[in-house]
Design a protein with these regions (language model features):
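Hydrophobic/aromatic residues within transmembrane alpha-helices
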Residues: 30, 39, 89, 115-121, ...
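C-terminal transmembrane-helix exit sites in multi-pass transporters
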Residues: 53-58, 105-127, 251-272
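Hydrophobic/small/kink-forming positions within alpha-helical transmembrane segments
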Residues: 21, 25, 52, 76-84, ...
């Protein structure tokens, strides 16, 4: 007897929340000793190794159409930029703060889903955008200046959000023609090939220690592998809006783990602003939920 689709959908959502809550922490540890570009290559190499077995088993679930190939190329490029942005955002910053701000991916994806996939978006989405922006401003309330350096973390986190939102919309457009694991291996393979073609980067990879590879492996497992694959599977059972809103709660896990591992806690302004960001996302979710 087959598993109830609702149970499968819930399983993938819970798995996605856990992965998204964990992944910023090994990124943060890796950034203590590794350059961002080198880290991205290492993470993608590890994620590729994790993904190959499942993709090989499902290798026939790929429709070789020009549109699908073009989307895979776009997803690979966006994934490279997104992971580089993660590394830049986390350097010298809080993993929890990054995770909260990057949840803006949810609203960006809703808007992109409205534009390209014709998923419903109403007035509450735009109210949610205003609430989220207010929360971000409050989180940076101690540095409300026009100094770009003070906002570097926020800008990199928003870049991450935009890239991943586009990845999810593009992935959902071919979800029934390309299995998520096959898609993941193809985009990772392309990204690794492009990055290793950069002069000198392969040589820098050879200097990584076993400890460095351990943190990169954990970052790859929770990020490009488990986080992305489980999320893409979740899109088979849920709209982008519903699935991404569930991931809103992942920063709570990040906050807990960051305190346990790094002994770091957000300031009062950051906690209040982060809560406001999450409220804004839940406002957006209420809009999508009322439309079904």
């Amino acid at each position: 007897m087959g598993t109830d689709p609702r149970n499968r959908g819930m399983f993938f959502l819970v798995l996605t929340i856990f992965a998204h809550g964990c992944f910023p922490l090994p990124y943060a540890k890796a950034m203590q000793s590794i350059q961002p570009t080198v880290a991205v290559v290492g993470i993608f190499c590890c994620a590729l190794l994790f993904s190959i077995p499942g993709a090989w088993h499902l290798r026939r679930k790929f429709n070789f159409r020009l549109k699908n190939i073009a989307i895979i190329v776009a997803v690979a490029l966006l994934g490279m930029l997104a992971n580089y942005s993660i590394c830049q955002a986390i350097v010298g910053s809080s993993a929890t703060m990054f995770n909260v701000i990057s949840r803006a991916e949810i609203i960006i994806a809703m808007i992109l889903g409205w534009v390209y996939l014709h998923e419903h978006v109403g007035l509450r989405i735009w109210i949610a955008v205003a609430v989220v922006l207010s929360g971000i401003l409050l989180m940076r309330g101690d540095t409300l200046t026009f100094n770009l350096a003070d906002w570097e973390t926020v800008l990199w986190a928003l870049c991450t959000a935009g890239c991943f939102a586009a990845v999810q919309v593009l992935s959902k457009s071919i979800i029934h023609e390309v299995d998520p694991q096959v898609l993941n291996v193809l985009r990772l393979s392309l990204a690794v090939a492009l990055l290793l073609a950069v002069p000198g980067l392969a040589m820098e990879m050879s200097t990584l220690t076993l400890g460095d590879w351990g943190w990169l492996g954990l970052a790859a497992f929770f990020g490009p592998f488990l986080g992305r694959v489980s999320y893409t599977y979740a899109l088979r059972y849920h709209t982008i809006a519903r699935a991404m809103t569930a991931v809103t709660f992942s920063p709570v896990l990040t906050l807990l783990f960051e305190f346990l591992i790094f002994g770091r806690m957000l300031s009062a302004l950051e906690l209040i602003g982060g809560t406001l960001v999450m409220i804004g996302i839940l406002v957006a979710f209420r809009e999508t939920g009322s439309s079904h």
